[in-house]
């Protein structure tokens, strides 16, 4: 008879192999899906994985699009280390963008070096406040944080859709759902001329290093409930 037992320690080999297995399974799943759709799976995988790396501009665009994902992953890793599940990163990122973008639009005519710090600060606060909602519901009403944080992501996307289709839509944007272009004072400095690669990538890499050092020196502890000691 077989029994399942919890590991005393995490397997280091499985920790190393898990990302590799995830990539392999993703590729195999893609091959199966494209084959079922009667599409060339190898050409599709080439377009997805290789083609963006064949030009310098493609590489920089890949880095630009990966930068917010890196920051999101770093933020989530802290909660996961404490066994706190947060499935609402997309919504928190979106609300941070709304708060920061709204600040940039409000200060669009201001020519001051203080505009960028204000935009960054409001972006952080927007994400924090949105993340506090499922935390409050969990502590006050014991609501499942996985469900509430996930559902709030859709709410955030609807708010963003309303803003870019309504009050924030650029009058000169040919009716596209987008805001006005932010002023240069609200934008991070460009690192490579002719691309969108900006200082945000440096911030993301620095945050990875800092959080790695923090988590590698931190013990994960979680509590499910508190009890009074019983007398012997």
Go through each PLM region and give its residues.
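Transmembrane helix-bundle core of multi-pass membrane transporters
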Residues: 149-221
């Amino acid at each position: 008879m077989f029994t399942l037992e919890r590991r005393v320690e995490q397997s280091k080999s499985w920790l190393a192999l898990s990302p590799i297995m995830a990539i392999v399974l993703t590729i195999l799943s893609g091959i199966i899906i494209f084959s079922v759709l009667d599409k060339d799976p190898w050409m599709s995988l080439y377009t997805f994985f290789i083609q963006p790396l064949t030009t310098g501009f493609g590489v920089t665009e890949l880095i630009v699009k990966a930068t917010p994902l890196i920051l999101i992953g770093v933020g989530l890793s802290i909660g996961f280390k404490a066994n706190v599940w947060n499935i609402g990163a997309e919504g928190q990122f979106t609300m941070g963008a709304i708060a920061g973008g709204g600040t940039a639009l409000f200060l669009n005519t201001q020519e001051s070096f203080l505009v960028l710090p204000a935009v960054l600060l409001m972006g952080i606060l927007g994400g924090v406040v949105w993340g506090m909602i499922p935390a409050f519901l969990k502590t006050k009403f014991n609501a499942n944080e996985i469900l509430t944080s996930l559902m709030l992501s859709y709410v955030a996307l609807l708010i963003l859709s309303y803003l870019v289709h309504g009050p924030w839509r650029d009058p000169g944007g040919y009716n596209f759902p987008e805001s006005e272009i932010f002023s240069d004072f609200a934008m991070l400095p460009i690192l490579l001329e002719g691309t969108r690669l900006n200082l945000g990538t440096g911030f993301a890499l620095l945050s990875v290093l800092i959080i790695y050092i923090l988590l590698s020196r931190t013990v994960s502890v979680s509590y499910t409930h508190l009890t009074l000691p019983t007398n012997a």
